[in-house]
C-alpha cells in the first residue's frame, strides 16, 4: 500500500460519507463508494466509474482501495488452501480457505502472533507481534481469490479476537451491514479463550456465533494448558453465557482438543456435562496436531468416539471436527508466520 494513504476497505458507510464530505463531494458519494467496494470488489479507485474524474483524483490524493493480494499459497491434498497475506505494518498473516462440498469456510487471523500462549498452539510460540488493522482483517476476505465462493467466515486463525475487539467488531459490522457484504451474522463465528469484559462486549454488540476454547473443564488443568484461565475462568465464561439466548439463530460452541491420557477420560466428559448443564450449546471435539517441543499427544479415534458418545447420550450435542490441511500446516493450532519465515518459505 502507498504511504500516507488511508485504505477504504473496512471503512463504514458513515466514515465514507464523512470522508467524501470533507473532500467536498456530493452527499451520495459515500454510498456509491461502498457499493464499489463491498458490492463489486474493485481494486482501484479509477474503477469507480460513476464518480467524476475530478472526484476520483481528489479521492486518490488521500485514499486507496487497500486491497493486498496474498504473496504465497500452499494447497493441501484435501483441497484446503493456506494463503500468506501482507499487512499494512509489513508483517504477514496466514489465512486458510476450506472448501467442503457446496460450502466454503475461510479461517481468518486477527493478530500477528498471539499473547495467550496456549501450550498446544504454534501461533502462541510465535509470540505477539501486533494487532491487525480492520483493513488487514477484511483484506483476507476482500482479496481472497475464492471470495465469491465463501459461505462462512470463522475468526479462528492467528490471534485472540477479543484482544483486538474494536477492529474485529468493525469487520463484522461491514460484513453484515446492508451497505457492506450484507451477510447474515450466522455466517460468521468468532472464537475466544475468554477475555474478561471483552467477551461480554462482543456478545452485546454482535449477533455472530461464538466459539469458546475450553480444552478442559477442570480449572487447574485448563490453566496449565491455557494461561488465560487465570484471567477469566471457564466457569466464569459459562456463567456469562447463561445470560444470553442461544436457542434461536445464534449458536454457542465449545472447542475441545482431545489429548491422549490428559483430558480424554470419562471424568472429563462428566465434568463437561455438569459444566454446561442448562446451556444451549454444542461441543466440537478436535484432534491434536503435533507441534515441535511440546509433550502432548492426540487421543485415539476410539477414545474420541467414546467421549463424543458419552456427551451425546447425556444431552450435549457433540461432533468430531474433521481435520483439514494438516500436510501444509493449516490445521487447528498450526498457524505461524514465524515458522514460514524461518523455513524460508516466504517470498
What are these regions (language model features)?
Residues 1-93, 242-250, 258-347:
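Auxiliary Fe-S-binding modules of radical SAM enzymes
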Residues 76, 109-110, 191, 213:
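Short linear Ser/Thr-Pro motifs
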Residues 81, 93, 104-108, 116, ...:
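Generic beta-strand structural signal
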Residues 89-98, 102-103:
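P-loop NTP-binding catalytic core
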Residues 99-136:
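Canonical Radical SAM [4Fe-4S] cluster-binding loop centered on the CxxxCxxC motif
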Residues 135, 139-147:
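Ferredoxin-type iron-sulfur electron-transfer modules in oxidoreductases and energy-metabolism complexes
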Residues 145-152, 157-321:
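Conserved AdoMet/S-adenosylmethionine-binding subsite of the radical SAM
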